Amino acid sequence: MNSPALPLSRGLRIRAELKELLTLAAPIMIAQLATTAMGFVDAVMAGRASPHDLAAVALGNSIWIPMFLLMTGTLLATTAKVAQRHGAGDQPGTGPLVRQALWLALLIGPLSGAVLWWLSEPILGLMKVRPELIGPSLLYLKGIALGFPAAALYHVLRCYTNGLGRTRPSMVLGIGGLLLNIPINYALIYGHFGMPKMGGPGCGWATGSVMWFMFLGMLFWVNKASIYRASQLFSRWEWPDRATIGPLVAVGLPIGIAVFAESSIFSVIALLIGGLDENVVAGHQIALNFSALVFMIPYSLGMAVTVRVGHNLGAGLPRDARFAAGVGMAAALGYACVSASLMLLLREQIAAMYSPDPAVIAIAASLIVFSALFQFSDALQVTAAGALRGYQDTRVTMIMTLFAYWGIGLPVGYSLGLTDWFQEPTGPRGLWQGLVVGLTGAAIMLCIRLARSARRFIRQHERLQREDAEAASVLGR
């Protein structure tokens, strides 16, 4: 008669874990939406200056955003390592770790900014950009390049606060950055308040300025809030330590490469579609923009799962870590069911929000169908990747991601969309079908990898427990 107690207990446990995940994920999601909104504001304000300015900003985005994701992705290892130390109750050990991560940011932030500053012109040349757009695009990119050092330092501090389970600072500063971006854009694009009239390139200098504001704001917050004092982050100082920075790079660089691979494949598909009819290009951009917006929620869940898995592993609870990953993936799938259903039902209305042109609406609506289809695989792969970051299992994840996107998705999409190898070329539909295949492949491989990693950690923990018990029994004799 007591059998119903177990399901009830499990149900309460699921609800408690889901509450923890959503509490972590909600501020992250708002911060990500604020960042996305900054890009939207840039596009609107540059577009009001002229189509020429908007084109320059769009070209610049195709260069700096993948590079930015590579840089910040490399620093994401800080979240998992801080989360594990926090879960283990090792607050004093967190400070030295984060200080070494800041040294790493001081290296790759300026280096990434220098690469963006000096290599943007050759990249634009390889892209065969119209000569009249090169100058404005370069000016736009140089403003952003000056903000890269601040962005790297900010992301380390953000990973630190997120790893402690404190996600509110990134939300507040994300909203603050958005609110500051608008007046700076207004001043630099249109030449108000005594500032030079820069047009679209002013967006880049505004973004670079906001990056510095967000870093200084996070630095002030972490330095003043009492919750962070136990880590003694700024009370001591050490030179760079290879023994600490090496593992950060070993875990973080594969994350950066995987994120770069995922973002760059969308850029490549945009370039492949760029040679087609302008209505096709517009429809593709609408579907892609809306897909990126919808992706923010499972992405935020994935970051929250990283923290929860890290906390549980640090506390010596590998079964709870696996449980947190499972609840996170179930929540992501539940969201995918809702988002996919709404996208299928409202695809034409969604497209009409972006354009009044019937031809563009028809193309965008047809592509949103494929976006709805990959909601499930996209939600699974990003949540599984977040859980694997919590396990600090990133190298194999990177290989799987590269293979899924570049070894499966892109070749399938290219074959179906732009060649007659299997049928008449279907244009953007074929390329989006390739995305569905690639994301599905990534989801399957990452879920299998996650199950194996979770099982391995549980076995290792149980083996250590048995060894400790045997050692204790020997000493007790």
UniProtKB/Swiss-Prot annotation:
GO terms for biological process: monoatomic ion transport; response to antibiotic. The keyword Zinc does not apply. It is found in: Cell inner membrane. Keywords: Antibiotic resistance, Antiport, Cell inner membrane, Cell membrane, Ion transport, Membrane, Transmembrane, Transmembrane helix, Transport. One of its GO terms (cellular component) is periplasmic side of plasma membrane. GO terms for molecular function: antiporter activity; xenobiotic transmembrane transporter activity. It is a multi-pass membrane protein. InterPro entries: MATE_fam, MATE_MdtK, MdtK-like. CDD domains: MATE_NorM_like (cd13131). The chain crosses the membrane at residues 21-41, 56-76, 104-124, 133-153, 171-191, 202-222, 253-273, 286-306, 326-346, 360-380, 398-418, 431-451. Signal peptide: none annotated. PANTHER family: FMN_FAD EXPORTER YEEO-RELATED, MULTIDRUG RESISTANCE PROTEIN NORM-RELATED. Belongs to the multi antimicrobial extrusion (MATE) (TC 2.A.66.1) family. Multidrug efflux pump that functions as an H(+)/drug antiporter. Confers resistance to benzalkonium chloride, fluoroquinolones, ethidium bromide, acriflavine and tetraphenylphosphonium chloride. This is Multidrug resistance protein PmpM. The lineage of its organism: Bacteria, Pseudomonadati, Pseudomonadota, Gammaproteobacteria, Pseudomonadales. The gene is pmpM.
